[in-house]
Amino acid sequence: MTTVNLAAYRFVSLDSIEQWRPLVAARCNTLGLRGTILLAPEGINLFIAGPREATDAFVDYIRHDPLFEGKFADLPFKESLSDSQPFRRMLVRLKREIITMKKPAIKPELGRAPAVDARTLKAWLDQGHDDAGRPVVMLDTRNAFEVDVGTFDRALDYRIDKFSEFPAVIEANRADLEGKTIVSFCTGGIRCEKAAIHMKDVGIENVYQLEGGILKYFEEVGGAHYHGDCFVFDYRTALNPQLAPTADVTCFACRAVVPADAQQSPLYVPGKCCPACHPGDSGTPGRRAEPGAEPARAV
């Protein structure tokens, strides 16, 4: 495997993103990187990929260049490897939010919700409760089509089609969360962090976010208490608990996830259609990925 894939995000107040955008894009292009970087007043969200020397140089740049005034000096990155470049081009975009919730009162850059690390969460799930004896509820904050690729055992899944639906479904299902320890989770941490802050703000108690999301959990403890793989918003489509790309692909036409067995169907035509959207099939078309949900569009 020769390509290094980096993912990172941070909620932090940023005032100079218009000035940063062309400079960051130029540095990434000089290094030969591809991917997506989102900049918003509330922070940064990125997925980039390239050779080791290029990704190392980018990490040094974002952490230490005076341009960023130390805001990313300790920015943590999640790393995985792939045989090829998963992105087609390099994009640096300005957004209102780095992950869209459409709740302007939420200010995650002003303080985080409590977080639980992977090893502590595994211990809670092993014993069936947290350290205070409360039952632990895993709350999936991702879109329904992502959940279908894999999720934690017995996780709550409200079948949302986009993250901006999250506040409404939580309000409608508060009874599911009362008296329990809630651990929100997502792919890399960004959605579950914002989700946990929202739940705290509306008065739900004992809420945690999974530090680093599913990918960090895989890195630290593997696939314990998790079934399936983890959808990612790039051309790898899904990663297994060893953080290796799976045989799943994304349908060119409808963006549905097509697992290996479905690729054997005569209704699957690479570059044209899959069993979910084949014109001769009466099935339901696959759900599309929400633009901006993760930094390949983006984390």
From Swiss-Prot:
Domain Rhodanese intervals: 132-226
Gene3D superfamilies found in the cross-reference section: 3.30.70.100, Rhodanese-like domain
Source species, domain of life: Bacteria
EC number: 1.14.-.-
Catalysed reactions, semicolon-separated: uridine(34) in tRNA + AH2 + O2 = 5-hydroxyuridine(34) in tRNA + A + H2O
Keywords: Oxidoreductase, tRNA processing
Entry's Gene Ontology molecular function annotations: oxidoreductase activity, acting on paired donors, with incorporation or reduction of molecular oxygen
Active-site residues, as the UniProt record annotates them: 186
SMART domains: RHOD (SM00450)
Signal peptide (from-to): none
GO BP: any one term: tRNA modification
Root EC class: oxidoreductase
Family recorded in the similarity comment: Belongs to the TrhO family.
NCBIfam families found in the cross-reference section: PRK05320.1
Functional note: Catalyzes oxygen-dependent 5-hydroxyuridine (ho5U) modification at position 34 in tRNAs.
Protein name in UniProt: tRNA uridine(34) hydroxylase
Gene for this chain: trhO
